UniProtKB/Swiss-Prot annotation:
Protein name as annotated: Synaptophysin-like protein 1
Vesicular side: 55-117, 173-214
Organism: Mus musculus (Mouse)
Transmembrane segments: 34-54, 118-138, 152-172, 215-235
UniProt keyword annotations, A-Z: Cytoplasmic vesicle, Glycoprotein, Membrane, Transmembrane, Transmembrane helix
Length: 261
């Protein structure tokens, strides 16, 4: 037991010595391993910023001749991240009653928060992981390349991140398609108040451009490509691709010395 405890202490002491030896080495950034990690870092920022920062609105015009109003009046519903459309109610201009209807009781249809939040949350985690990985590449280059576990952990995380980028981007792309439908021309069909029997005629006017959301989907799949491509370069750092330095040194010095002639 004492020998095992001493071995553990020695390992921790060696690890602490390596961690304390922080030296900035920018050479890994010139290699694909570090350079692609920088691209992944930037791409993750664009992914969660373009999605999480979106705010928009959709407008319809209302005409109700049965109550003596023959002019079109505008009713607006605002929405944004995390896209709980079923909580986005319609609003009229201040101190204006449109067709004697309480429009705040009428909301958009659909809840797409699960796909949007999963996408943004994962992108933020990727952003933080890229910072930690770059710090390890640049500040602890020797520790990373002399270790067997760190490159393997990095490789596993890279594979998992590639898969999750595919899943989250696909789910978010599908949700975005549904959001466009739910905030577009179909509003008039879905609103119960907009029917001839109620005497209220509704006409779709406009909806905020969702170009930034389209960009977020593009960056999602771009991230998937970057992480998938970087998996090869991370794999090359693992013991699966090349033997460790320890094994190499044993193989070189393990044979019996040759006798001179």
């Amino acid at each position: 037991m004492a020998s095992k405890a001493n071995m553990v202490r020695q390992r921790f002491s060696r690890l602490s010595q390596r961690m304390s030896a922080f030296q900035i080495n920018l050479n890994p950034l010139k290699e694909p391993l570090g350079f692609i990690k920088i691209l992944e870092w930037f791409a993750s920022i664009f992914a969660f910023a373009t999605c999480g920062g979106f705010k928009g609105k959709t407008e319809i015009q209302v005409n109700c001749p049965k109550v003596g109003v023959n002019k079109n009046q505008t009713v607006t519903a605002t929405f944004g991240y995390p896209f709980r459309l079923n909580q986005a109610s319609f609003h009229t201009p201040p101190n204006v009653s449109v067709c004697d209807v309480n429009w705040e009781k009428h909301v958009l249809i659909g809840d797409y928060s699960s796909s949007a939040q999963f996408y943004v949350t994962f992108a933020v985690f990727v952003f933080l992981y890229c910072i930690a990985a770059l710090l390890l590449y640049v500040g602890y280059t020797n520790l990373y390349r002399d270790s067997r576990k760190l490159p393997m952990i990095d490789f596993i995380v890279t594979l998992v991140a590639t898969f999750l980028w595919l899943v989250s981007s696909s789910a978010w792309a599908k949700a975005l398609t549904d959001i466009k439908v739910a905030t577009g021309h179909r509003i008039v069909e879905e609103l119960e108040i907009c029917n001839p029997e109620s005497g209220v005629s509704c006409y779709f006017v406009s909806v905020t451009s969702m170009g930034s959301l389209n960009v977020s989907v593009i960056f999602g799949f771009l991230n998937m490509i970057l992480w998938g491509g970087n998996a090869w370069f991370v794999y090359k750092e693992t013991s699966l691709h090349s033997p460790s330095n320890t094994s190499a040194s044993h193989s070189q010095g393990g044979g019996p010395p040759t006798s001179g002639m």
